[in-house]
């Protein structure tokens, strides 16, 4: 259900009913649950792979600019010249997050962003999202990630939306009190 909801709000699927509309100042970036389409059959290395997503950024034409973005996601040295088709699941997640950072979006939609990541990578993602000034819509089974990042919990269950301000622990406590 969550993946379907994200696909609908990102325009990849049509809703069965109802409508939604992003505001005119909203720019979105999407981290899909399945990112294989971005890597399968691709013969590019990391730097060149990232370059295909930067034509709108004039300063991104330099290798040092792209390496800096990849460095934020813990790619360094000769790792940036690895072919993307041989990357591990965690490395692909880190590439996708680097790609998202390039867009400068003010809304991020993340479907299970910590899947396949080691602790160091999860920490890097957490730190980046805590500093992010926009809106983050995400689904995750990683309770620590949810507790660290979420300040509003929305639960879609049986056709009903529950919306609560506060952390995940606050939300759980409210369920216990009922």
Task: Enumerate the predicted regions with their spans.
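ABC ATP-binding cassette signature C-motif
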Residues: 1-178
């Amino acid at each position: 259900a969550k993946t379907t909801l994200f696909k609908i709000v990102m325009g990849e699927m049509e809703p069965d009913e109802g409508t939604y509309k992003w505001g005119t100042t909203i720019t979105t970036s999407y981290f899909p649950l399945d990112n294989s389409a971005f890597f399968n059959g691709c013969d590019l290395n990391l730097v060149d792979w990232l370059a295909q997503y930067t034509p709108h950024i004039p300063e991104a034409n330099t290798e040092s600019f792209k390496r800096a973005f990849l460095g934020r996601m813990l790619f360094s040295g000769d790792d940036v010249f690895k072919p993307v088709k041989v990357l591990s699941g965690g490395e692909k997640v880190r590439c996708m997050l680097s790609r998202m950072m390039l867009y400068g979006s003010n809304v991020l939609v993340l479907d299970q962003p910590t899947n396949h990541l080691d602790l160091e990578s999860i920490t890097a993602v957490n730190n980046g999202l805590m500093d992010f000034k926009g809106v983050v819509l995400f689904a995750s089974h990683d309770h620590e990630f949810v507790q660290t990042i979420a300040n509003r919990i929305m639960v879609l269950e049986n056709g009903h939306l529950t919306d609560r301000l506060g952390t995940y622990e606050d939300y759980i406590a409210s369920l216990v009190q009922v």
